[in-house]
């Protein structure tokens, strides 16, 4: 087993069975290739990323710790699991943080003593058909930090993170946000409550002895950034020096020539 090895190119051998694999640590010849690379291969940064600016911009794939960022505030774009956990960590480290929230599902990390992965399994949600063609991939906001916990955007805001809508434009030192923050939060809440309802029904139907958890349905009051969302932000005036693009990945099989 070799670790830290990047596969650069793989192609079928000429005239005989097998493959020639070029890697960052030399060439390997093998009879079989298993491409278990998953969907998270190539970091994606949208075309709206401002070019040649004074901002420090990185994809979430290249973020490791708060200390790698320059002094100043941070705009985190994307509120899936990566974006939420990065924003949370930065705020805890003393950074002023803005979090751009798009459409998402927000499952409970745990409910009635069971992890959300267990619930997805017993409720058949791993095999569920998509509700809308073209929406096969849904951003999921869930955290594994500090032992794992349910993502609560209102709680993040009450702690000091400013929530904004989907980022539409980033240019000339200004960020423009969509008028969709309230709807995105509402739909995330809806997906959360739907899973709780389905879990409760499953417990009743199967006669399981799992403790009730009524507090899971309690939401904090809406923070000001949600009731009166920003639609435009002057980055310099806000003291923002960094942008983290937590905007997902694309598949990339250009290395595989078979």
Locate predicted features.
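Flavin (primarily FAD) cofactor-binding/catalytic cores of flavoenzymes
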Residues: 1-258
């Amino acid at each position: 087993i070799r670790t830290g090895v990047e596969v650069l190119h793989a192609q079928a051998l000429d005239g005989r069975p097998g493959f020639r694999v070029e890697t960052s640590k030399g060439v390997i010849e093998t009879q079989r290739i298993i491409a278990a690379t998953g969907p998270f291969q190539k970091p994606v940064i949208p075309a709206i990323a401002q070019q040649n600016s004074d901002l420090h911009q990185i994809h979430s794939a290249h973020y490791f710790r708060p200390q790698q960022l320059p002094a100043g505030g941070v705009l985190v774009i994307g509120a899936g699991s990566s974006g939420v956990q990065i924003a949370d960590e930065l705020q805890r480290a003393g950074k002023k943080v803005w979090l751009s929230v798009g459409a998402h599902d927000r499952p409970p990390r745990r409910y009635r003593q069971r992890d959300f992965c267990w619930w997805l399994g017993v409720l058949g949600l791993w095999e569920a058909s998509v509700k809308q063609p073209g929406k096969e991939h849904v951003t999921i906001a869930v955290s594994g930090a500090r032992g794992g916990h349910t993502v609560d955007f209102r709680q993040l805001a009450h702690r000091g993170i400013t929530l904004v809508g989907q980022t539409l434009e980033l240019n000339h030192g200004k960020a423009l946000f969509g008028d969709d923050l309230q709807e995105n939060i509402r739909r995330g809440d809806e997906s959360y409550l739907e899973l709780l309802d389905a879990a409760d029904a499953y417990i009743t139907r199967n006669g399981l002895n799992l403790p009730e958890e009524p507090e899971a349905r309690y939401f904090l009051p809406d923070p000001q950034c949600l009731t009166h969302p920003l639609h435009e932000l002057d980055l310099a005036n806000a003291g923002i020096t960094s942008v983290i693009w937590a905007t997902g990945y694309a598949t990339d099989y250009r290395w595989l020539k078979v």
